[in-house]
Structure formats: structure tokens, C-alpha cells
Amino acid sequence: MVEKRNIFLIGPMGAGKSTIGRQISQQLSMEFFDSDQEIEKRTGADISWVLDLEGENKFRIREEKIINEITEKQGIVLATGGGSIQSRKTRNRLSARGLVVYLETTIDKQLDRTKRDKKKPILQNKNSVKSFLEKLATERNPLYEDIADLIIKTDFKSAKIIAHQIINTLFKT
């Protein structure tokens, strides 16, 4: 029997956190949470609207509180927002409360996976998207790497295969 420790998925938008998180939760019969969806559920608004209305700083404070609340639960899988790791408190909580898996992907794969995403307004301006994602990668990748218990490249595998790989690696017997 697999010990049901919390599993926290981190990484940039388009890495597959939500899709892979659902796969893991189904395979291990664990409850799944997506911090972006939780924000939408609690505010009754799209994540992009909340971010635009509140601004980045207030949004990150809201996100930090929600992630803190979710990570106090046991036996869960959590897909975090790509920028959630910018909060030192959030990084510390994730590290202390579960297994942290960094889903790594290339900028080109992010562009491919997010090109039809209407919830992310920055992605609609095609001229600046690649440079924006490169800037985020430069800022965030070291933070992802710093707290990761496991790093998985997601570019050339299905969500189901990646979920199996994560489960097999984290819960080797």
C-alpha cells in the first residue's frame, strides 16, 4: 500500500501540472486541488480577472493563503500556480508538508500548450509571449529547482506516463 503523502506539483504554465495532478490523484485515490481553480471558485471570477483587479502583490497574498490552507490537508495532490513559488512562505510550506515535483518544460512546449488559453491575457499578445516566458523562466526556474524533491521533464510524454513515472519514483518499495 502506498503511503498517501501530499504531492505538490510546481512548474511554469503549460507544464501540465493540472492534467498530471488529476492523473496522479486518480491513480492513488487522493483528493486533487488546483490553486488557480480554488481561487476562481472562492472569488467567483476567472483567474485573469482576479489578477488584473487585485494586482500581482494582492493576488500573491491571496494565493499564499489558499495554498497554506490546502497544504494543511493530508493525502492530497496540489497543482500550484506557476508564480506561487515566488513566496518564500509558500516554498517553505510546500517543502515541509509534502513531496514537491517540479514539472519542467521548454519555452517552445509552453507556447504550444498555452496558445489557445483565453484565461491568460499575456498569452494573447503573440509578439511578447516568448520573451515574457523566457523572463519568467529566468526568475522562477531556480526557485522551482531549489525546493523540488523530484524534477520531471514533461515535453515528450503523455500525462498518464508522467503520472506513472512520478508515482513509481516517489513511492519505490
Swiss-Prot record:
It is an enzyme of class 2 (transferase). PROSITE patterns: SHIKIMATE_KINASE (PS01128). Its cofactor is Mg(2+). It catalyses: shikimate + ATP = 3-phosphoshikimate + ADP + H(+). ATP binds at residues 14-19, 120. GO terms for biological process: amino acid biosynthetic process; aromatic amino acid family biosynthetic process; chorismate biosynthetic process. Binds 1 Mg(2+) ion per subunit. Mg(2+) binds at residue 18. It comes from the Bacteria. Its main location: cytoplasm. Keywords: Amino-acid biosynthesis, Aromatic amino acid biosynthesis, ATP-binding, Cytoplasm, Kinase, Magnesium, Metal-binding, Nucleotide-binding, Transferase. Gene3D superfamilies: P-loop containing nucleotide triphosphate hydrolases (3.40.50.300). Belongs to the shikimate kinase family. PANTHER family: SHIKIMATE KINASE, SHIKIMATE KINASE 1, CHLOROPLASTIC. This is Shikimate kinase.
